[in-house]
Structure formats: C-alpha cells, structure tokens
Amino acid sequence: MTGRDAAPAGPALEVVEFTDPFCPWAWGSEPVLRALRRALGGGAAHRRVFGILFDEDEEPAPDPAAEAAWYGEFVTRVSAHTGAPRPARLHWVAASSWPASLAAAAAEAQGPRVAERVLRRLRESMFVRGEPADTPERIAAALRGVPGLDAAALAVAALAVAAASAPVRERVARDRAETRAPRPEVVGLRGAGPHPGGAKEIAAGHRYALPTLLFRGPAGCRVVPGWRSAAEYLAAARAVCPRLPAVPDGRPDPAELLRRHRSLTAPELPDGPPPGAVAVDTPGGPLHLSPEEAAVSPLLSAS
C-alpha cells in the first residue's frame, strides 16, 4: 500500500500511530509496538494520534449494565487473540474517550517516558481493573504515583472544565479529524481475521480501525492497519525507508524491559518474568509490575 507522500522533515522515517486508550486491540498490540520502537530506535519520528473510539456526542446506552456485559465479552474475545490481560468484569463502558485522550496528549509535554506511563495507566484502568478512567477524578486516581508526572500541570492542561479551547483539546480534535480521513487503501479493505483493519463505517463516513500505523519515508507511504506482527511493521518501514539500520539480534533482557516499562504482559516475557516482578492476575493472563510500580499502582490498592 505505497503512496506518494513526501518524506518527513527530521528523521527519514515517520511512524504515525492511530490509537485510543480504551481500544482492546490497541491494548493487545502494545508488546509489538514497543518492540517496533526499540527496533527503530532514534531512526524514526513517532507521532501518536488519538482517534476517539467513544465520542462525547454518542447517546448513552439505555441499559448500561447490559452494555458493559456485551462489551466485556468483546474484550474477552480480543484478549483470546492478543494474549493481553482482561478484567474479570468490565464495570462500565467508557462514557467518552475524550478525557483520557486529553490526559494522554497533555502528558506528552512532560516527556516520552511520562507520556508512555500515563497512557499505560489509562489502559490498565480498563483492561486490568475493569474501571475505565473516563472522568477527571478517575484519571487522577489512575495516574497516582506515575514517576515524574506533574499531576497539577496535567490537570490544568487537559482536565479543566474550561479546556474546550485549550491547545490540548485542539490537538485531540485534529487527531479525531485525521482518524476520520483514512487513506483509500483501507476503505473497503477485507482480509482474514481476527482484525484485518479495514476502515470502519461511521455516520459521517469512515475512520481508521484501531490500531493503524502509517509509515512515511523517502520511498512513499504505507498503511498497516489492524492486528499485525512486528515483522509486518518492519517490512513496511523498510519499504518506505530502505536505508534503515539493521535490527539488533536477540531478545531484550526481561529485567531491563521491566525496569524501563514498569509493566509488562505475558507476550513480552516468553520465558517468564524476571526475579522480583509482582504479578497482577487476570482471566486473560498476568500483568507483571516492577517492585517500584507495584508500590504505587492503583491496581494493587483497595477498591
């Protein structure tokens, strides 16, 4: 799926990730996307686009409990494919993706490590605890103890009542619009399951399936939608940027991975967790926390 897009400024390769904090396929893809970022290293510019899976203008469900049960079953089916943890019970469906997306976008101003941890905590609120952080109060609780996070600055930037015209909201609004202008290659795309990634039909047209990655480089653009392997992502990156450096051989050290990310799932640890990891058990498999993360994680606090 090669286009004629101009090569980006800066690094020769740009990777654009369309995602949402509460998308189960995006949650399950995190191990592969982390591996992709490690493989590309500093040779790529990464940009995350928040697609707003649950929009704020949607009508509330007439039976919230039934909706939560139905969506929980969907999460269970996705988890069976991805190997990602899932909650024993989804207590509610997120009322909107906007508050969490605003928080995740605002966190980017505090650096990539903080931004990654914020998005991870938001995902864990839904896919481990079963209580999606979809309000400012729930977001604040989910982010308690994130190392390096200036929670007050995040609240001012993303969660204030008067944020409708703030730069962060304008950015996420652009993200939403970009997600709803998919490239023609994915409109009408059909393929083998479980998630081939064809653009989703919506009332206003189409939006990208989540996750979808765009790779832009000197040789054009490729779009890689849906549930994909690291090899497929790397092949697309090399197709548009043939001079990418070789990917280092060997698996990353599990202890170093846990130290860096503080939270890992079973697909990232094929040989098991390193010593000292703290397991949070779920019906979809364990989430492994570093001792430092376990000491502050809301997942281990009393309900």
Where are each of the predicted segments found?
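A generic structural signal for alpha->beta connector loops
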Residues: 12, 43-45, 276
